[in-house]
């Protein structure tokens, strides 16, 4: 059975090599050669990279162009292990070099402004156009800000839901927290992507705290009254961490109105 780490390598083709097989320009892609078909994929994360790989597997002749704005991709899977000090950032860092080279895929590092379905063009932010026969749109997800927590709060209270820049910030905050401090996490209301995610994070943070800051405490302020795999997590927390973790349901004081990250 393939594990999550190997799956990431398989799909994304993790490598430390340079980006010589990738391009930041879309020159020569404004038209499609006669008797050719081109699939343009917007987004080079799990969805886009897997689509590119399997399209090539099923069709050796189709031209595949993958447009991804970032030259490095950090996987959300295993980012909690980085936050808990069990892995380094390089462990979750990937690029598209191997995918491009091994499967003959053109990678364009640019931001997409729009997909012009009427004219079958992907329009880049710089105005360049990439013509397509078929288009796949897989840009991933973004964090949804709620009242009382805005983008301005991220510097002081990073959510680190999207792995990358915020991941080491949260890891450093946890590392610098005094022994006897309190780690507070707000779990979102349904629906949201990866329902077990917040509780996986709490589990790994608890592992770190038990080992390094045993006098500290974790409080989970949940915006709902039950959560995914609750019995499994609750039993594991009790067995491994005793009363280290305090989970508060929305109806019993978990509901959050606003956050003051400066005053904490």
Model-derived features: where do they sit?
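Beta1-alpha1 glycine-rich phosphate/pyrophosphate-binding loop at the start
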Residues: 29-106, 189-231
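N-terminal secretory signal peptides
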Residues: 1-3
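A Rossmann-like FAD-binding core segment of flavoenzymes
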Residues: 102, 106-114, 122, 130, ...
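N-terminal export signals
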Residues: 6-28
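Core beta-strand elements of the Rossmann-like FAD/NAD(P) dinucleotide-binding domain
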Residues: 126-134
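Glycine-rich dinucleotide-binding loop and its adjacent helix/turn
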Residues: 139-212
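Short, well-ordered coil/turn residues at beta-beta hairpins
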Residues: 10, 138-139
């Amino acid at each position: 059975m393939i594990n999550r780490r190997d799956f990431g390598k398989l799909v994304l083709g993790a490598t430390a090599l340079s980006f010589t097989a990738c391009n930041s320009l879309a020159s020569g892609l404004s038209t499609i050669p006669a008797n050719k078909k081109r699939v343009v994929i917007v987004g080079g994360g799990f969805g886009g990279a897997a689509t590119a790989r399997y399209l090539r597997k099923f069709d050796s002749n189709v031209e595949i162009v993958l447009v991804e704005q970032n030259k490095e991709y950090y996987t959300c899977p295993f980012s909690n292990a980085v936050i808990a000090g069990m892995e380094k950032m390089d462990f979750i860092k990937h690029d598209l070099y191997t995918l491009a080279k091994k499967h003959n895929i053109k990678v364009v590092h640019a931001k997409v402004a729009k997909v012009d379905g009427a004219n079958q063009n992907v329009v880049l932010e710089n105005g360049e156009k990439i013509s397509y026969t078929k288009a796949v749109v897989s840009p991933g997800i973004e964090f949804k800000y709620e009242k009382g927590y805005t983008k301005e709060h991220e510097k002081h209270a990073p959510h680190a839901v999207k792995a990358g820049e915020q991941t080491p910030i949260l890891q450093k905050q946890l590392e610098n927290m005094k022994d006897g401090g309190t780690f507070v996490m707000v779990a979102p209301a349904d629906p949201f992507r990866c329902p077990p995610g917040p509780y996986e994070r709490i589990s790994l943070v608890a592992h770190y705290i038990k080992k390094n800051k045993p006098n500290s405490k974790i409080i989970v302020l949940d915006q709902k009254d039950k959560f995914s795999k609750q019995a499994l997590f609750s039993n594991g927390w009790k067995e491994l961490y005793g009363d280290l973790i305090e989970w508060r349901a929305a109806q019993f004081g978990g509901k959050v109105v606003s956050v003051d990250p400066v005053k904490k």
